[in-house]
């Protein structure tokens, strides 16, 4: 897999990007001609004309990653069609508008992604591989941006990635392998992204996804959708998508797993310090700015769960401090507005109608112990809202509406909440 870019593919991608850019202009009602070089950060983070903008994407968007200056959004996209493009869409952001600049082909099925803190690398989970791309080349259009594909195991199902604050280590959720792979990113960069940079694997259980660091970088929180048999937890959860009236419980709850980051960097197999029951099929996780609470979407419980992080290691049975019923099959979660609110995507991903538009639920973080009373209202979304990204200034939210092939852009300073009974 040494060379994944050909002149034919580049031509196809450029043509494809041009078509999508025209679509974008029609939706955002922009008549301006903008350059493709990054404007000043203040222009990049300017407010849009409307509180919500739906930007069409060239495929199903999975994850938006935003540059530290807010000028660029990198979105992993898949099509499910072997004749179409799977890759990373690059969008420039200026004067409150997004413009699709180019789509870069990636072999496989790109899903979770992250930018290193120096903004130099875009790292993408890609099934059996982790993909490394040069962001400067992507933005300038000069040179091949593909730096390497690193295999972390056959059929591993790499789905999510995150890096430590110092960019020294990379963590990869292997959904099929039931592990978290730890990679020495410094070594990978120096040696051409070879498997020799893999430090080892953390055994976590069925379908791990979330990779969220505590603010001080000491702990990594991940999720296992179904706890391993070795935990000896009771069977409480019904199969997802089954008729809740007739289905019987078949699985134990899933878990939040707490990892000692320093230990994981040298001895991954022995780095787990806590396992906490977290509802049925916990998937994504966000943490409060002060690190005092973590919030997890329990997809098969149709709920957001809140946990006290100080109790997760010492008193895991007492760590749950709130359960908020949200919409159907919640997936994405973000803590916004300085930790005062939580936003959850209600994916409804197992519904028979996969094109129906869904909602986001907005929650008062101070009231999570009150359950449903903590809900402030809803925000309109596309079909299968999946993943949430934020601009570095905390003023803009990016939601990947997977089935409707849209990137939803929300102005958090003008949060367009629809309250119960509001029309």
Predicted regions and their residues:
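N-terminal secretory signal peptides that target proteins for export/translocation
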Residues: 1-10
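Sec-dependent N-terminal signal peptides
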Residues: 9-21
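Predominantly soluble domains enriched in secretory-pathway, periplasmic, or organellar proteins
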Residues: 16, 27-423
